[in-house]
């Protein structure tokens, strides 16, 4: 019996809202790769590196099918999916790669 691993189906956007749908086993690592241009091709060329949506699946076949389903949708349906959970289109990976030990804002006045 094989051990199941969680897979993530995710949607990235550029500042101009170009969309990319992908699948990964390690969302944090994949986002690092996208944000640092380490994956050549579409996402690097169009700066598609803001995580605007993701969901998890416990079976690889379910994740692959879901990715395929989303990729087959018209843009409007993808936008509705994103906005159903992230109306502000914030980058859900914001702050994941901040340097550790970075000083926060000063609490002193004056």
Locations of regions flagged by a protein language model:
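Short arginine-rich
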Residues: 68-81
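GIY-YIG nuclease catalytic motif and its immediate N-terminal context
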Residues: 1-40, 44-57, 61-68, 85-109
